[in-house]
């Protein structure tokens, strides 16, 4: 068994036990603080703002890459690799956040913790929809994408992806103050998510036949096919008022629980896929070496 497979399995056990690192020691928090610090500079010309935003995003990416390449001796290098991959995925923390929403009676403040839209304007069904959509999106951002890049580039791939994803989450807005500054981060995140988002549809297909084609046809945004697939899998209406509406029955708190169970099953599938992909890469690299 290759060392990267051991890193992956150890990471998953750590995630199941802990959930996520404390904020002070969380690399994703570091990326967020760094981009927040850099974005304070303002420029009047949009083109200059776009290039400066790209420069800042590249600084965060470089910082993340340096973290993944720090030359620790064994076994510290193994532990560091586990920690970085652990901080790049989000399984238990997503499950916990979604369950808090259910246990609170789908309270607006609880839902606001995991979505960017204004929950004060949403009905109870729309609040449930927002949570389910968040679970579906996190399956791509917090599971499939980091594991996909880990399977190709090792820990560095997962870490760099997470840095880009964090920049997008912080400043990658299509409108408002970050429209120019966050353009590069938003576009780069779209590019990096393109394959993982569609790969996730294959995993949905294993749970319900037809999910792959439905996700492609009903893609609510560039990489929102997992939302469409989750709607199809659960048979519920998922909507973001003013943006998209997927047909189905009105969602309830019980459907959030169903989404959580589906998320866990889909994560197991993604882990199996990643283990196989990493093993194949190791075998191919070994043959090329000899």
Swiss-Prot record:
Topological type in the membrane: Multi-pass membrane protein
Pathway per the UniProt entry: Cofactor biosynthesis; adenosylcobalamin biosynthesis
Biological process, per Gene Ontology: cobalamin biosynthetic process
GO molecular function, one term: ABC-type vitamin B12 transporter activity
Key words of the record: Cell membrane, Cobalamin biosynthesis, Membrane, Transmembrane, Transmembrane helix
InterPro entries: Cobalamin_biosynth_CobD/CbiB
Residue ranges of the TM segments: 5-25, 50-70, 71-91, 140-160, 266-286
Gene Ontology CC, one term: plasma membrane
Signal peptide location: none
A Pfam family: CobD_Cbib
Subcellular location field: Cell membrane
Statement: the UniProt record of this protein carries the keyword Endoplasmic reticulum: no
Functional summary from the UniProt entry: Converts cobyric acid to cobinamide by the addition of aminopropanol on the F carboxylic group.
Family: Belongs to the CobD/CbiB family.
Protein name: Probable cobalamin biosynthesis protein CobD
Gene that encodes the chain: cobD
């Amino acid at each position: 068994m290759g060392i990267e497979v051991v890193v992956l399995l150890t990471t998953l056990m750590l995630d199941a036990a802990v959930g996520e690192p404390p904020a002070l020691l969380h690399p994703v928090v570091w990326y967020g603080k760094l981009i927040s610090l850099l974005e304070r500079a303002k420029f009047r010309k949009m083109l200059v703002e776009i290039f400066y935003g790209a420069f800042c995003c590249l600084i965060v990416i470089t910082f993340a890459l340096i973290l993944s390449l720090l030359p620790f001796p064994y076994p510290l290098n193994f532990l560091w690799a586990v920690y970085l991959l652990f901080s790049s995925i989000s399984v238990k923390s997503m499950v916990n956040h979604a369950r808090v929403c259910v246990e609170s009676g789908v309270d607006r403040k609880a839902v606001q913790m995991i979505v960017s839209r204004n929950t004060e304007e949403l009905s109870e069904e729309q609040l449930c929809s927002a949570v389910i959509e968040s679970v579906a999106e996190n399956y791509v951002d917090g599971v499939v994408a980091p594991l996909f890049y880990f399977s190709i580039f090792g820990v560095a791939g997962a870490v760099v992806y997470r840095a880009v994803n964090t920049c997008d989450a912080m400043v990658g807005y299509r409108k408002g103050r970050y429209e120019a500054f966050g353009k590069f981060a938003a576009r780069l995140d779209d590019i990096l998510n393109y394959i993982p988002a569609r790969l996730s549809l294959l995993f949905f297909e294993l749970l319900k036949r037809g999910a792959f084609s439905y996700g492609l046809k009903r893609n609510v945004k560039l990489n929102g096919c997992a939302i469409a697939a989750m709607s199809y899998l659960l048979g519920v209406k998922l909507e973001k008022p003013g943006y998209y509406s997927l047909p189905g029955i009105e969602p309830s708190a019980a459907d959030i629980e169903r989404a959580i169970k589906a998320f866990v099953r889909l994560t197991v599938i993604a882990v199996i896929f990643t283990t196989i992909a990493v093993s194949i890469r190791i075998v191919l690299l070994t043959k090329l070496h000899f």
